[in-house]
Amino acid sequence: VDYIEHVTDEFREIYDIVKHTKPYTGLKVAILNAWGRLRTWQAHMVAHELPYKQIYSYLGIMEALSGASVDVSFISFDDIINDGVPEGVDVIINAGDAGTSFSGGEVWKNETLITRIREFVYNGGGFVGVGEPTAVHHQGRFFQLGDILGVEREMGYSLSTDKYFTKELKEHFIIEDIEDVHKIDFGENIKNVYGLTSATEVLEFSNPKVSAGGVEEGIVLPANAEGKEFGEIHLAANPYGKGRGVYIAGLPYTPENTRLLMRALFYAANKESELTKWYASNPLVEVHAYPEKGVYAIVNNTNELQSTLVYDGAGVSRTVELEPSEIRWEKIS
């Protein structure tokens, strides 16, 4: 009874503060699929709260964005074909398995669609693809916007073509918070993804194998007789004109994957310096600011004590200690 009283009081406090106002957001992100606004905040199937092998690798995107300091909209392929990329969008996300309404399937043969997205990115926008984005067999390509993402998927038609670009970058903005990139959870993974050019920034390259304990770990197998590595890219970035593309093989929900996605979005948008505004260095802690109300909340998402650097709207940090599950409200100075 005491705990229920605590939770309801906490809810009332949150509602009294956030009603009739909007939180600070550092980016405007558009999720691109066939549905657009018709399925706003609806995931890859109806019973999405259940663990399905075919969709869990994408559910972390929605979960991460729902609590992130980004303004999210949902747009359809027809929206872009008819009207172009909406004004103000910083980054487009296209995520899903090939042939689904979420990835797009045959629509990626539409030249108006791919031309307008290329123009958007070339002029400074960002494009993040997860799983099999922009995927359809057409004109010798599978990922139709592989030139933006910097990667392509080998489908058996170019096995004799050497795949040279396998060397991982040891330092990069996207993986700055990650101790071991080979322990990132990419879910079901996408096989046989390779780098297209030397400009592709390979951030994770491995051949996932299941260990004796049943835990999938990224392992690069020994080179074969020709010196090639048996593996594939699961995380990469790529420059495209003034903009950037980012490829992620899959994104199940974890606090670490939430941080990975945020870094990928800010990197794709060329707004790395904006990340550390109303931000916590600890991925288990969130910061939500409400400038119109002059307050911000620091949230401990765990049942354990947490310590973190908290950054204000000017990017100035200080150390904060939080009790388990604590929500701490403070005034914006």
Each language-model region and where it sits:
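Catalytic beta-strand/loop cores that center a nucleophilic Ser/Cys/Thr
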Residues: 41, 157, 162-241, 252-259, ...
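Short acidic/histidine-rich motifs immediately flanking catalytic phosphotransfer sites
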Residues: 85-92
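A glycine-rich, often tryptophan-bearing local segment used as a flexible ligand/cofactor-contacting loop or short
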Residues: 104-187
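The substrate-binding groove and active-site-proximal loops of carbohydrate-active enzymes
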Residues: 1, 46-52, 94-109, 251
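C-terminal beta-strand-rich structural cap/linker in extracellular carbohydrate-active enzymes
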Residues: 319-333
